[in-house]
């Protein structure tokens, strides 16, 4: 399994090397320092090293599975709760998206939600599962592109870690 980031409710991500903005000006895909959602994942500096996050295409969208070592479950749940709280405040209008700093991943997640993608989050004892689905082919295509980008960015992070460039 790939080392990972998070399966957030809006969560749906890590490395400092990838956290800087790209030369094109688009935000980094994962930004553990600047993203209002993702920064919750590094409050416990050992959390990311002790969890996995995998993404899979399914017929009508994508599936993500997150596992966390038992001794880090509390930190993970605290991060999840903080991210969910931000998501709820955005949905209710208490916060405006323009006022909430977000990485590329979290921006894309929000865009998919605005396109009508349906999300389900299942919290289990052994793993958490996140589903993002749609009945609209154009939205399914975007969901799968999102999952592929996550796989690609996680692979880059894994390569950077192996090369000793991350963290």
Predicted regions and their residues:
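N-terminal domain-start interaction segment
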Residues: 36-65
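Bacterial Sec-dependent signal peptides at the C-terminal "C-region" and cleavage site
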Residues: 16-25
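Bacterial N-terminal signal peptides
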Residues: 8-16
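A low-complexity, Ser/Thr/Gly/Pro-enriched, surface-exposed linker/loop concept
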Residues: 24-46, 72-114, 150-164
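Short, solvent-exposed interaction modules
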Residues: 100-134
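Terminal, regulation- and interaction-focused segments at domain boundaries
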Residues: 57-74, 127-131
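Short, well-ordered, aromatic-rich surface patches in folded extracellular/luminal domains
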Residues: 124-159
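Positively charged n-region of N-terminal signal peptides that target proteins for export
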Residues: 1-4
């Amino acid at each position: 399994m790939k080392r990972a980031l998070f399966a957030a409710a809006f969560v749906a991500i890590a490395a400092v090397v990838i956290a800087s903005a790209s030369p094109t000006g688009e935000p980094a895909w994962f930004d553990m320092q600047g993203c209002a959602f993702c920064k919750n994942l590094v409050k416990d500096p050992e959390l990311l090293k002790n969890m996995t996050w995998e993404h899979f295409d399914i017929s009508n969208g994508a599936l993500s599975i997150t596992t966390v070592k038992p001794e880090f479950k509390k930190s993970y749940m605290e991060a999840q709760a903080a991210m969910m709280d931000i998501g709820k405040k955005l949905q209710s209008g208490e916060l405006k998206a323009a006022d909430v700093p977000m990485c590329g991943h979290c921006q894309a997640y929000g865009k998919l939600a605005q396109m009508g993608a349906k999300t389900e989050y299942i919290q289990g004892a052994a793993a958490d599962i996140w589903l993002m689905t749609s009945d609209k082919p154009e939205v399914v295509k975007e969901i799968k592109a999102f999952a592929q980008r996550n796989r690609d960015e996680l692979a880059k992070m894994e390569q950077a870690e192996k090369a000793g460039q991350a963290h």
